[in-house]
Amino acid sequence: MTAKKIYFASDFHLGAPNYKDSISREKKIVEWLSEIQVDASELYLVGDVFDFWFEWKHAVPKGYVRILGKLAEMCDQGIPIHFFTGNHDLWTFGYLEKEIGLKIHREPVEVNLQNKLFYIGHGDGLGIGDAKYKVPKKVFTNKTCQWLFSRLHPNFSFGLAN
């Protein structure tokens, strides 16, 4: 019997730079997920799976049905999937947890995996310096700013994000 494996991936940036390239990349990612599904004990998605993701109360971004379906299937199969928010997909407010089954992490975590200690996180804004990014990140993660942004129509919001 072969040991189960733990997989890590990040920075798919689905949705960019255009529909054709994104859908092609999404299909390849889903193919890879199907391959690892047979021996995965856990999957860590370490940020920027989507180039832009924002959940409204009654709407989520259109598209991504292939990857979302595959991730839901893997969760239903009992494979824990850890989704670390990145600087492009940090606006998750329950959909990915409730409907897909992902475990959302908004901050880096220390975790012991197979008797080895790992520090896992997307990495954006963690180092000293990088003030040009840390200030906007405070705005992006501010609850009031998120609430205000959620009042914008998704068509306008996506245009603004791009």
Language model region names:
Residues T2-K5, A9, L14-L113:
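Core catalytic region of metal-dependent phosphoesterases/phosphodiesterases
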Residues E31-W32, G69, K116, K143-T144, ...:
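Short, intrinsically disordered/low-complexity patches at protein termini
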Residues L90-G94, I120-G121, G127-D130:
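Short, well-ordered, mixed-charge alpha-helical segments that flank or form enzyme active sites
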Residues G123-N162:
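Active-site-proximal loop/helix segment associated with metal-binding centers of metalloenzymes
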